[in-house]
């Protein structure tokens, strides 16, 4: 999303999405966006615009495999094609580069490492690369772990940590997240989170609290 401002609020782009389940394990997803996003309710903008000749197109394709054994896992990979390229400059603004075909690819993994009774440890990993841009994010790597009923006495209380590194053409940004999902009642959860972010501008911290009801 750092290189493609198509679904980042307040921007929105028209999309056609296909989700096809091949069998109990394999799934294919395909999304085709208008290549330029527009602001909602802004005069002169139309979020339902479809104009490939002037605004280009943006394609996302993903193939995933899920296993449902004791040590369950989810593995997915995909690629994007975009022929209207926006990039972030050092001031965080979006600038339009020369129109050209732009490719990127990624891989995502969720894997159960340990499961016994109600105790569970899961690994998360993701990687993406885009080598065809002059500005913006060229590589992204992330690793995380979730602990269910390991630190706390209930599986509904889960501790998670995640570290990711984004390599931009103008520098590197590393961030850490520590979060704790607390089951308050059967259908109500609280999830405090703490983020630590480091880049060439310095080190910054963010705290947040999420609430969910299902």
Where are these regions (language model features)?
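Surface-exposed coil loops of outer-membrane beta-barrel proteins
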Residues: 1-58
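Membrane-embedded beta-strands of outer-membrane beta-barrel proteins
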Residues: 16, 61-63, 107-109, 123, ...
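Residue-level signature of outer-membrane beta-barrel architecture
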Residues: 20-22, 65-67, 111-113, 147-149, ...
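Short loop/turn motifs that connect adjacent beta-strands in outer-membrane beta-barrel proteins
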Residues: 25, 67-75, 114-121, 149-159, ...
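Transmembrane beta-barrel strands of outer-membrane/channel proteins
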Residues: 28-34, 75-81, 123-129, 143-145, ...
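Solvent-exposed loop/turn segments connecting transmembrane beta-strands
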Residues: 53-54, 99-100, 129-140, 167-173, ...
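C-terminal hydrophobic structural anchor segments
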Residues: 135-189
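Outer-membrane beta-barrel "beta-signal"
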Residues: 203-214
């Amino acid at each position: 999303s750092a290189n493609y401002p198509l679904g980042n609020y307040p921007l929105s782009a028209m999309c056609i999405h296909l989700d096809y389940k091949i069998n109990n394990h394999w799934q294919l997803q395909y999304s085709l966006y208008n290549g330029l996003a527009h602001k909602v309710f802004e005069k002169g903008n139309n979020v339902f615009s479809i104009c490939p000749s002037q605004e280009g197109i943006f394609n996302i394709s993903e193939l995933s495999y899920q296993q449902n054994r004791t040590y369950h896992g989810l593995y997915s990979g995909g690629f994007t094609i975009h022929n209207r390229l926006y990039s972030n400059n050092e001031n965080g603004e979006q600038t339009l580069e020369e129109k050209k075909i732009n490719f990127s690819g990624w891989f995502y993994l969720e894997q159960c490492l340990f499961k016994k009774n109600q105790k569970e440890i899961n690994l998360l990993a993701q990687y993406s690369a885009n080598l065809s841009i002059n500005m913006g994010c060229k590589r992204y790597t992330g690793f995380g772990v979730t602990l269910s009923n390991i630190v706390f006495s209930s599986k509904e209380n889960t501790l998670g940590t995640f570290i990711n590194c984004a390599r931009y053409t103008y520098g590197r940004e590393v961030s850490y997240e520590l979060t704790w999902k607390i089951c308050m009642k059967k259908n109500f959860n609280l999830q405090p989170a703490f983020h630590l972010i480091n880049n060439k501008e310095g080190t910054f911290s963010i705290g947040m609290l999420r609430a969910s009801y299902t």
